Amino acid sequence: MTKNLDSYFKGKRALVTGGMGFIGSNLAIRLARAGAQVTILDSMITDYGGNEYNLAPVKNEVRINYCDIRDENAVNYLVREQDYVFHLAGQVCHLMSLTNPFPDISINITGTAIVMEALRKYNPDAIVVYTGTRGQYGSAVSFPVNEEAPTNPKGIYEISNLTAEKIIKVYNDVHKIRSVLLRLSNIYGPRSQMKHSRFGVANWFVRLAMDNDEIQLFGDGSILRDFCYVDDTVDAILRSAVTEAAYGEIFNVGSDIPVPFRELVETIINVAKRGSWKFAEFSPERKAQEPGDFYSDISKIEKFVGWRPTTSLTDGIAKTIEFYDAHRDHYWKKTSTEDKTVEAAKLAPAAKCQ
């Protein structure tokens, strides 16, 4: 890449589905600041992570559409004339999918098909970047996990992400809609929802520490994960979008530095200077769902795209806490119903170990 990354997007049109969510809003802000003409598509479904305040830094610089990716007429209209489509909308909670799989099937699978079919009909020259999940692999058979590893997802959410990825791959291969397929590991940082424990373990642990609450650490704390700061993730998304060699490829986005959960928790508490933790026993149900150790092989995206994460865990946690300290009211603020949900989440088993 011979010029500044942001310069590739100056004056370009970019559609971000799920653009008021955690990663989508950070991406939209980066694009707007780079001079792109940004369109947001977000249905703002309750408890799915969307937050209008996420876009506060660029609220007058982006075009926001409150609609669902399953609305064919809206999607058909919005994809027209876009240079880039960053597809991040979806139901993103593993635990919710265990008791109600239909949003995953409807939003993640059908919604993705609607987006891709709209592009085929009305804008086949657009470049697509899709963000899936490392959960598509299921339990790892060797480490670090590369893109050739078998995919044996353990839940409906992960199955829906894998299916959406395969749908997009077909449109790339058959209909020549240039697409990049990313499998994200454990992403953390500013602008995540912080009202309940269902989305992302690292951010939820940050909330518990900031509230000076006790974090439950299941097992012996030795389970390994890789954690990637959201700004690094956005950088991977943008770099892959402008790299021709990346089109049609699958890439892991994470860190090749595995971190035991105990180290994660201790880092959060040390940086926050509050909070505590204790060991807890796995319930039989949680133990059956736990995939065990996971950390990514990111050598492929480094080779093709030139991307590596640059934010250390300690620095990323510090930036995350600094953000929520400054903007707490917009993420902790609750209705009476949400207040009960948060208290229940604090009393329930710890956040899903993504």
Regions found by a protein language model. Give the residues of each.
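Short, conserved loop/turn and helix-capping segments at secondary-structure boundaries
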Residues: 147, 158, 196-199, 295
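Short alpha-helix within the catalytic core of nucleotide-sugar-dependent glycosyltransferases
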Residues: 52, 203, 234-238
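Short acidic-hydrophobic sequence patches enriched in Asp/Glu that either
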Residues: 46, 193, 197-201, 260
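Hydrophobic alpha-helix immediately C-terminal to the catalytic Tyr-X-X-X-Lys motif of short-chain
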Residues: 163, 167, 171, 201, ...
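A conserved pocket-lining segment of Rossmann-fold NAD(P)-dependent short-chain dehydrogenase/reductase
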Residues: 97, 149, 179-194, 204-228, ...
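N-terminal Rossmann-like NAD(P)+-binding domain of SDR-like oxidoreductases, especially those catalyzing
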Residues: 1-187, 326-327, 336-348, 352-354
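Short, solvent-exposed loop/turn segments at secondary-structure boundaries
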Residues: 99-100, 142, 156, 192-197, ...
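C-terminal substrate-binding subdomain of Rossmann-fold SDR/epimerase-dehydratase oxidoreductases
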Residues: 27, 33, 67, 210-354
